Design a protein with these regions (language model features):
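Mid-to-C-terminal alpha-helical segments outside catalytic/metal-binding sites
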Residues: 196-197, 214-259
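Glycine-rich flexible loops
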Residues: 171-175, 183-190, 240
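Acidic-and-aromatic substrate-binding clefts and catalytic sites of carbohydrate-active enzymes
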Residues: 147-154, 175-183
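Exposed alpha-helical structural elements
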Residues: 53-57, 130, 182, 240, ...
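Beta-strand segments within the central parallel beta-sheet cores of soluble alpha/beta enzyme folds
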Residues: 144-146, 242
Length: 259
């Protein structure tokens, strides 16, 4: 928070002060044609927080006092909800990458710092309650893309996407699932529960710029293979299959992301 105060020339005495800075930052990127924000959160966060409660937590943390898990979730939920509110006003897409537990190997973190291979996935997460609370707060007012690490959660996210309609989409297979096998399994499953057209398409947040072409090429080949198999089994007419592939690979994705 000290770096934020220095960068923006403000004193963060309340949660609203932080929200004001967030608004300024959001305006800066919006003026430069940003169309999405990406949020990595270990557990889904509710959208029904009370500002007064979150403000108390913020002031407590700024005073150097320790926070409970519930207090941290209250603050993080408030911050994410404010980000989503700003996104809904400007038409940005809100990406939620769910379930990654960061830096679990202490010796690796101590010697090399964060994000160097010490992250894992967490299967024991309750997606439905908190996530539905968040989505209900912005029902039909916010484009959201949901990503999960554990394929066991695909059923929950696919049915949530279907329940909330076209503005809540499923993201492409992520991280350890971002392989031909992982992509195929995901596409086959979401096709089976009738959400294939409610798919956000391939989006890469990779730091490896030179891999962009190969990653998108691999996804399109897997997509064509999966849909082609469905045509071969008589599950889908060829004309519809071509429209689906075209939409996921380009047309629908371009429209969803406001490109």
């Amino acid at each position: 928070m000290g770096r934020i105060e220095e960068r923006f020339g403000v004193k963060l005495a309340s949660l609203q002060d932080l929200f004001d800075v967030l608004n300024r930052s959001h305006d800066y990127f919006a003026a430069r044609n940003c169309v999405a924000s990406d949020h990595g959160i270990e557990i889904p966060l509710r959208g029904d927080y009370e500002y007064a409660d979150a403000d108390k937590v913020f002031r407590k943390a700024m005073a150097g006092e320790a926070l409970t898990n519930d207090e941290m979730n209250c603050y993080m939920g408030a911050f994410l909800t404010e980000c989503a509110r700003l996104n809904s006003e400007t038409g940005w897409v809100t990406q939620l990458h769910l379930g990654a537990v960061r830096d679990v190997r202490k010796s690796l973190f101590d010697s090399m710092g964060p994000d160097v291979g010490g992250d894992i996935s967490n299967h024991y997460l309750d997606y439905a309650g908190a996530l539905c609370s968040f989505l209900n707060r912005f029902d039909d007012k916010l484009k959201v893309v949901l990503y999960c690490l554990d394929q066991g959660h695909q059923a929950t996210l696919a049915t949530i996407s279907r329940a909330f309609g076209s503005k809540v989409a499923l993201g492409s297979a992520w991280w350890l699932c971002d392989t031909p096998i992982g992509m195929r399994r995901q596409l086959e499953y979401i096709g089976a529960v009738d959400t294939l057209m409610n798919f956000a398409g391939m989006v890469s947040d990779s730091r490896k710029l030179l891999s962009y072409g190969s990653r998108f090429e691999m996804f399109r080949r897997v997509l064509s293979d999966v849909v082609g198999d469905m045509v071969g089994r008589g599950q889908m007419p060829e004309e519809i299959a071509l429209n689906i592939v075209r939409s996921i690979a380009y047309d629908g994705t371009k429209k969803f992301w406001n490109f």
